[in-house]
Amino acid sequence: MRKNMADYRIGILPGDGTGREVAIEAQRILNTIEQHTNQGFEQTVIPCGGQHYVETGHEWAEGSFDFCREEADALYLGAIGHPGAFLPNGDLAGGSVILGLRSGLDLYANLRPIKLYEGVPHKVHGKFTQIWEPGMVDMTILRENTEGLYHSLLRRSADRAMGRTPYEPPEMTFPGLQGEIAYDPRPISEHGSERLIRMGFEIAETRNGAPIDGKKRVSCIDKSNVTRGCQLFRRTFEKVSQNYPGTELDYGFIDAFTQWLTRSPESYDVVVTSNMFGDIATDLGAVLQGGMGMAASGNIGDKNAFFEPVHGSAPKYAGMNKVNPIASINSIQLMMDWLGRKNNDEQLIQIGSLIDESVADHLREGKGLTYDLGGTATCSGIGESIASRLSTKLQERF
């Protein structure tokens, strides 16, 4: 029996291009859960993004940020980016949505699971083949989400979203440099590092360890041999780690890590790193799991969170019903797990696991694959297939 009132209020921000199409598949999963459990979701759709800016002169409607901050229990975002859509200062139109939420809601942890499902090939040299082995790629990378090299842009975006005067970093001089100079400060704080790293250790407690040996391991990836910010990050890692004596510690410099990530992914369990390093490394990690169409993410703070596929809006494919919706569907899986743990709702945690199982079952057959995985299946077709499998599992479980 369904409850009369929705248990959770979910903000749906479809965004631009193919983001709108994969958002439909995310909503399909939410609707499937509602149909077969006593969980209810009040879904509020908020038009936003670059195209919305071109059409209306606004990145999203007034009051949207306040709704996301004060009323929504969780948020889903499709993708942001429309050809030629920029603000007068040159920033991406729609940045107040994705970046403004990250900074304005203090979503300090970007959660990127990197998991290879059975049946997923890798595209190398224009051919689809099996490079990495399922079961040997299963890690979570936590990227600091509010500081570092992107701090100024994040702050400006949050200021616009909250109606404040946009922040600009102070002017600086750089001895020895000539001509035009552009720069972005890279501030890293002990507070920001500590809360991210602590979350990494807490997540490691819930996992099964690294594939190669089953050991719970947290890897600190930085450039502490060069930068002061990374030296602070590593000192903070060592401080926080003292509270988790049962977890193995690992260290690496970001340049070497990119090699180890591709050659020995089975050695990694949980990775913590700074903002820009994590931005680059997680997209490289997406190659191991089959590409950006497989890469889901969560942007998580102490009170709020939003979940999104990490791929772009792919405007050239908009309206063609061909992009991969699995990153979008797995973003809902992450949402269910986060809501469940935040609200002590064990059923939601189980539902998240069933979404993961439904995706795995679909991919294991190796038939319903979109173009990015070497197939011809449609976006909606895959969404329907996974929702159907989930429906069966929910009926059997609940």
Stretches with model-predicted labels:
Residues G11-Q35, M162-G252:
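Glycine-rich phosphate/diphosphate-binding loop of Rossmann-like nucleotide-binding domains
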Residues D16-G19, D73, L142, G200, ...:
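Buried hydrophobic positions in well-ordered alpha/beta secondary-structure cores of metabolic enzymes
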Residues A26, L30, S328-M336, I386:
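Buried hydrophobic packing segments
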Residues H36-G63:
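N-terminal beta-loop-helix "entrance" segment that forms/cooperates
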Residues V45-Y53, R228-V271, N275, D279-I280:
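Active-site rim loops that border cofactor/substrate pockets in soluble metabolic enzymes
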Residues Y53-M172, A182-Y183, M276:
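N-terminal glycine-rich phosphate/adenylate-binding segment common to multiple enzyme folds
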Residues T258-E365:
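Glycine-rich phosphate/nucleotide-binding loop
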Residues R341-F398:
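Internal helix-turn-beta structural module
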